[in-house]
């Protein structure tokens, strides 16, 4: 089995769990407040800022450099959305939630210790954005009564065909010079990334403590198996 397929199979349960959080299910039904949504946009800004900052450091790395793909970057789009939701002084207003900060800290931690694990975070975030972005854009637009503003996050102006691009992305994953041990560690990290996303979503629903305990216990169990 190639690495892209192993990564997909190895994160299937976590992916499904993330899609079934109360926040995501409400979002998919079009039940979301503007306040919750702009808080999500704010948290995503900090997550992507960390991920993209760290990937730039490794853009010439023999492994990570292959996934330095500026056309995927979301920070500029999120900045535009935050300006819409919070106004021109948004930088002095927004701050990461506790759940978001844990996510950001984890990204920086692996960048400094085992940088190849960043691949798990890269995969979890960007492939998901490409896969469901247009559907989520339509839901958010209708639920929040938006026109053309506040939705830049879902727009990939430099990617003409998401389906073809995802195949290219998977091909890059398959060609990465990784050992079996590194691949397994990346799959474990990708599962943890999904859990960190779930913690962020649950925080928006007010279930942060229970969610965080589940995340930590799940991560510990994954390390013991």
What are these regions (language model features)?
Residues 1-225:
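Metal- and O2-centered redox machinery and metal/ROS homeostasis
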């Amino acid at each position: 089995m190639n690495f892209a397929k192993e990564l997909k199979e190895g994160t299937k349960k976590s992916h499904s769990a993330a899609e079934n959080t109360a926040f995501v299910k409400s979002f998919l039904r079009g039940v979301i407040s503007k306040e919750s949504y702009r808080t999500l946009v704010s948290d995503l800004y900090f997550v992507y800022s960390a991920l993209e900052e760290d990937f730039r450091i490794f853009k010439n790395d023999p492994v990570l450099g292959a996934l330095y793909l500026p056309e995927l970057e979301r920070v500029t789009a999120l900045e535009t959305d935050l300006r819409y939701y919070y106004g021109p002084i948004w930088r002095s207003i927004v701050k990461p939630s506790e759940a978001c900060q844990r996510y950001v800290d984890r990204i920086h931690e692996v960048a400094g210790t085992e940088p190849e694990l960043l691949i798990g975070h890269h995969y979890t975030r960007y492939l998901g954005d490409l896969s469901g972005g247009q559907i989520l854009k339509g839901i958010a637009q209708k639920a929040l009564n938006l026109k053309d503003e506040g939705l830049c996050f879902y727009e990939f102006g430099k990617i003409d065909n998401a389906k073809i691009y995802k195949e290219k992305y998977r091909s890059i994953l398959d060609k990465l010079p990784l050992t079996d041990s590194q691949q397994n560690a990346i799959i474990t990290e990708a599962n943890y990334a999904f859990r960190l996303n779930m913690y962020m979503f649950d925080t928006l629903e007010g279930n942060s403590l229970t969610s965080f305990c589940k995340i930590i216990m799940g991560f510990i169990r994954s390390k013991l198996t």
